[in-house]
Amino acid sequence: MSTEQPAPRWAAFARDTNETKIQIALNLDGGAFPPETDARLNVSIADGHATQASKSQTISVNTGIGFLDHMLHALAKHAGWSLALACKGDLHIDDHHTAEDVCIALGYAFAKALGTPTGLARFGSAYCPLDEALSRAVVDLSNRPFAVVDLGLKREKIGDLSTEMIPHCIHSFAGAARITVHVDCLRGDNDHHRAESAFKALAVATRQATSRVAGREGEVPSTKGTLSV
């Protein structure tokens, strides 16, 4: 029996524009970060903002928007990722560029880390509650970027994050990751709970979709024979 370990599913890069400066490192299976991880992330991790470390995961998110950090922390935790992400954006304007660009960068990192999707489940679905709120997420590693998001949020803001940006963040992530996602909050009175249950459901569905299937190594989970085009 072969004891060869699968290749790491990780990515690290910086994304700099006139609007945002982002550094990101992602490991879809938890554990260590790639050797090319930007040294600036070490400072962010040491700061301890939205940070959690265990034997299986390291998570540190610092975007300058507290509620966005909270949502991405939940996404990484329940997807089983190690994620280090730091952003300095033009928050003196508003939260749009920062929230959008961070989720685009996360989607690109996801796609790069995933590579050619062979030997994987491909599909994932999950329901996640948070007290009175219940959300459902369905994910397809389709290479066909599409998102349908209905969270039913009523407040203008949660913390410093505009609620209109919360579904937009999921759209931005799905587009850059080149996946199909459907995320719905089915019930709930508290907008914080509605949003958080949605991100947790997305996390669990994504973890399921990216899981390796024993005995199907190298197989493409598609009748088309490829998910690369």
Curated annotation (Swiss-Prot):
It holds the Pfam family IGPD. InterPro entries: IGPD_sf (IPR038494), ImidazoleglycerolP_deHydtase (IPR000807), ImidazoleglycerP_deHydtase_CS (IPR020565), Ribosomal_Su5_D2-typ_SF (IPR020568). It is an enzyme of class 4 (lyase). The keyword Acetylation does not apply. CDD domains: IGPD. Transmembrane segments: none annotated. SUPFAM superfamilies: Ribosomal protein S5 domain 2-like. Gene3D superfamilies: Imidazole glycerol phosphate dehydratase, domain 1 (3.30.230.40). The lineage of its organism: Eukaryota, Fungi, Dikarya, Ascomycota, Pezizomycotina. One of its GO terms (biological process) is L-histidine biosynthetic process. Belongs to the imidazoleglycerol-phosphate dehydratase family. One of its GO terms (molecular function) is imidazoleglycerol-phosphate dehydratase activity. This is Imidazoleglycerol-phosphate dehydratase. Its EC number is 4.2.1.19. Keywords: Amino-acid biosynthesis, Histidine biosynthesis, Lyase. It catalyses: D-erythro-1-(imidazol-4-yl)glycerol 3-phosphate = 3-(imidazol-4-yl)-2-oxopropyl phosphate + H2O. Pathway: Amino-acid biosynthesis; L-histidine biosynthesis; L-histidine from 5-phospho-alpha-D-ribose 1-diphosphate: step 6/9.
